């Protein structure tokens, strides 16, 4: 449905040439939700704006719905863009129009009959859960409701593709979850292909099928969500996954913790599990094999793409040699181990 091939985008500032995207290639299959994640300034927004040629690539090709947009004349490009909806971090609603009026705008620009516009607006408001807000104005809506209006408006022309540019970044967590649930529902109900960009791995975890990691204008890793959470290959992907899980060391442990090992002190370990290591009885195995006792302080587990992953804080009590052997055993079984200190 979407194929970007060797996309490079450069900007000229005076005598300086800035490369925002460098040889980026990706493919999004029809009906898929594809996430691109990266830090601020990585090139995410430039990438998604190249898909509908709001930013024209310096080189490379953009194919959407089997049409090479980069070679279309302007008139045909305008027609092709009707098959590509887009929503943004900021909702860009017209304050002087009601909810229904905002949703109707693209239909009016297409010169549809008023009766057809009214029917379509009613359908879209129902789809977005805004049936009771048709006559409300944007100033009277919450952030989540405004984004729902923007989604309904983006779907007005029955696009085959929806581009989401940091669509939940300005929303609180509960509202973010409701918007993501709406996007997932639309994807499943309409078979809509969705390409979204975000800096939050939690967004990818909740709704995406595939994910790519972008850094300094380059895609450094692409895979299914389940595979990336199971076996992240780059440090940046690993950091994004870690950001979805966080455990604080309890206050009483912090007060007793030392940086250096000494006789009688027990190491506090942070263990990160992905893939098969999550369900394997590895702590029990270390106790049997290496004569160590493990005391779990706290743990958090989650799912992404059908794969379980998690993080755990534990005390590992044993002599230094046995503890070192137990840690090595965990690492051999794809558990990331960090010694946080000693108590």
UniProtKB/Swiss-Prot annotation:
Alphabetized PROSITE patterns for the sequence: ABC_TRANSPORTER_1, ABC_TRANSPORTER_2, METN
Top-level taxon: Bacteria
UniProt subcellular location: Cell inner membrane
Entries under Pfam families matching the protein: ABC_tran, NIL
EC number of this enzyme: 7.4.2.11
One MF annotation (Gene Ontology) recorded for this entry: ATP hydrolysis activity
Protein name from the UniProt record: Methionine import ATP-binding protein MetN
């Amino acid at each position: 449905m979407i194929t970007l091939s060797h996309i490079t985008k450069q900007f000229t500032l005076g005598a300086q040439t800035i490369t925002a995207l460098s040889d980026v290639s990706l493919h999004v299959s029809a009906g898929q939700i594809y996430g691109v994640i990266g830090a601020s300034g990585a090139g995410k927004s430039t990438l998604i704006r190249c898909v509908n040629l709001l930013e024209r690539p310096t080189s490379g090709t953009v194919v959407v719905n089997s049409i090479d947009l980069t070679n279309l004349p302007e008139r045909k490009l305008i027609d092709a863009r009707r098959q590509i909806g887009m929503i943004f971090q900021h909702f860009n609603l017209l304050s002087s129009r009601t909810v229904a009026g905002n949703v109707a705008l693209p239909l009016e620009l297409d010169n549809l009959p008023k009766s057809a516009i009214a029917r379509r607006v009613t359908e879209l408001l129902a789809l977005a859960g805004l049936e009771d807000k048709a006559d409300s104005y944007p100033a009277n809506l919450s952030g989540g409701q405004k984004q729902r209006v923007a989604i309904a408006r983006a779907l007005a022309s029955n696009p085959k593709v929806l581009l989401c540019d940091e669509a939940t970044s300005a929303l609180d967590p509960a509202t973010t979850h409701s918007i993501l649930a709406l996007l997932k529902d639309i994807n499943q109900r309409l078979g809509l292909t969705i390409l979204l960009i975000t800096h939050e791995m939690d967004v990818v975890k909740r709704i995406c099928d595939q994910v790519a990691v972008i850094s300094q204008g380059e895609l450094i890793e692409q895979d299914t969500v389940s595979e990336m959470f199971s076996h992240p290959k780059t440090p940046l992907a690993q950091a994004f996954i870690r950001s979805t899980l966080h455990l604080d060391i309890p206050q009483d442990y912090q007060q007793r913790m030392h940086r250096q090992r000494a006789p009688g002190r027990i190491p506090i370990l942070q263990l990160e599990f992905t893939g098969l290591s999550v369900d394997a009885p590895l702590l029990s195995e270390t106790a049997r094999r290496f004569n160590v006792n493990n005391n779990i302080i706290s743990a958090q587990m989650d799912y992404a793409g059908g794969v379980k992953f998690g993080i755990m804080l534990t005390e590992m009590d044993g002599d230094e040699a046995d503890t070192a052997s137990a840690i090595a055993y965990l690492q051999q079984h794809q558990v990331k181990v960090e010694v946080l200190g000693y108590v």
